[in-house]
Amino acid sequence: DALPILFGEKQKGEAGESVVSLPLSSLHSFKRHPFRVPDDEKMEETVKSVRQYGILVPAIVREDKAQGNYEIIAGHRRKRACELTGLSEMPAIVRELTDDEAVIIMVDSNIQREDILPSEKAWAYRMKMEALSHQGVKGEAYTADLVGEAAGDCARTVQRYVRLTYLNPKLLDFADHGKVSLAVAEKLSFLSGEEQGWVLKTLGGNVAVLSKSQAEALKEESENESLTEKCVADIINREVKRISITISAKKIKDYFPQDYTKDQMEEVIFELLESWKERMCQDS
């Protein structure tokens, strides 16, 4: 086996922890692991790296005495890469962790990935918030702030993502595929399961037509306990007046160098809008 040659039967981790080589058959996924492990292009790159260099960063696992094996805390993609490479073992650090400690490590080791779906981020944030709450961190806003700090999101954004975990699975799937915005999905999450079912029935799969104002109207009717199936249909089928904003080049040209092209101006404007949105998020 290539791994014992690369790592030896036992090495030391960065903090003096022992690194051991464990059979892949003795490793199982983290309970309620919210992240996908797809066989995509990035996995192909990981497999190539494993073939060339081996596993450079050991997985983190904990002993599962009930099953007589180990639960992966961090390293699900590395394990899959080892399987695809044909290896039978992989290096790992075995730690004694509580359920809450394990959740926090699991989330933090995955949350910075670029290809995370809204549903994955939503469940990861919720799991970490619950874990921190169990550890004595008080206050939803403060807990959300701690969770967001590790992921580069503000507390309000974290709370909005957590709301997605209360969505009908079909509506959550729409959010994953970009058919509904985070703002609309958040509003719909306050509806009961039955009410969300009415929304799906009325939309017939065409959820992209639902605007934020319509979603807000649905939420308000639900909170007032006056939302019926007919009311859902009336709100969704209501024609919404679209807002269109046009800014003439004459009004903004003085803010840019004379040699700036239209595309360069647009790029600067959108960068400024993104900065403004981030500040608004932090203040909310």
Model-derived features with residue positions:
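Amphipathic, charge-rich alpha-helical segments that serve as recognition/docking helices
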Residues: R80-Y166, F190
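Short acidic DE-rich linear segments
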Residues: P4, E278-S284
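Helical mechanochemical/support elements of P-loop NTPase systems and associated helical scaffolds
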Residues: P23, D39-K42, T46, N69, ...
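Short, charged/polar connector segments at secondary-structure boundaries
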Residues: D1-R95, M106-Q112
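Short polybasic/polar patches that bind polyanions
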Residues: R51, E83, E149, A175-D176
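Amphipathic alpha-helical extensions and coiled-coil-like segments
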Residues: W123-A131, D145-L146, A155-E278
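Glycine-centered loop/turn motif at secondary-structure junctions
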Residues: G54, G86, G152, G178-K179
